[in-house]
Amino acid sequence: METYVNKLHEGSTYTAAVQYNVLEKDDDPASLTIWVPMFQSSMPADLLIKELANVNILVKQISTPKGPSLRVMINSRSALLAQMPSKFTICANVSLDERSKLAYDVTTPCEIKACSLTCLKSKNMLTTVKDLTMKTLNPTHDIIALCEFENIVTSKKVIIPTYLRSISVRNKDLNTLENITTTEFKNAITNAKIIPYSGLLLVITVTDNKGAFKYIKPQSQFIVDLGAYLEKESIYYVTTNWKHTATRFAIKPMED
């Protein structure tokens, strides 16, 4: 089994982002990616990852108003994992590598192939795209980040476009907007990291909360969902060999 600890915060209390790669234990096993709802922990990361690697995982494919989903049950005999959610539902479209192999409404045990733990800042120092969007009044434009990664083994590049936030812009300001936005994001983007969670996340440490980063606390972490980019690679391979190399920005008028 592979285990991986990614420390993006060194404080005594942190937010634990846990993701598993598992394989069903049946005659036609499906490969699954499972992420646990984030939780707060003060346990040393090296100890927590050992406990996380020794749990039992059961999954069942179900249908929900949000589409195909996986109900996950994690069983552990360790009291040290009391803070970790043990029953939760995740999106099957992100989780499943080969959905045709997963039976419907059948509870199936899984073998853990890899486990990743990322230590983020405490909950009050984390911000998501949804948090920012809710605070935008009368938005007119979207800020899109084009995140570039390089596989240092193959030298191949991957560009992942991701929505950051909506903003309200007057027409007379459009000519200078892109330069301003790039300047505001420049320092933060140099601190960007990718982590395995619900596929992949981009974690940006915010050094300045002016302009596009308004409403974010300085030195907090801004979390951006990049999607299901771990389907064909292991947790360890991506986090070790995918390096963030650059980010460009596009300012797009909102579509009706």
UniProtKB/Swiss-Prot annotation:
Q: Region labeled Nuclear targeting and binding to host importin KPNB1 — which residues?
A: 110-183
Using the record, list the residue span of the signal peptide; answer none if the entry has no such feature. Answer: none
Q: How does it sit in the membrane?
A: Peripheral membrane protein
Compartments (UniProt record): Virion; Host cytoplasm; Host nucleus; Host cell membrane
Extract the ranges annotated as region (Interaction with M2-1). 1-110
Q: Which residues carry this modification: Phosphothreonine?
A: T205
Q: Which Pfam families match?
A: Matrix_Pneumo_C (PF23766), Matrix_Pneumo_N (PF03393)
Q: Where is this motif: Nuclear export signal?
A: 194-206
The UniProt family comment states: Belongs to the pneumovirinae M protein family.
Job of this protein: Plays a crucial role in virus assembly into filaments and budding. Early in infection, localizes in the nucleus where it inhibits host cell transcription through direct binding to host chromatin. Later in infection, traffics to the cytoplasm through the action of host CRM1 to associate with inclusion bodies, the site of viral transcription and replication. During virus assembly and budding, acts as a bridge between the nucleocapsid and the lipid bilayer. Also plays a role in the inhibition of host interferon-beta response in a RACK1-dependent manner.
Q: What is this protein called?
A: Matrix protein
In its UniProt entry, the species of origin is given as Human respiratory syncytial virus
Give the source lineage, highest ranks first.
Viruses, Riboviria, Orthornavirae, Negarnaviricota, Haploviricotina
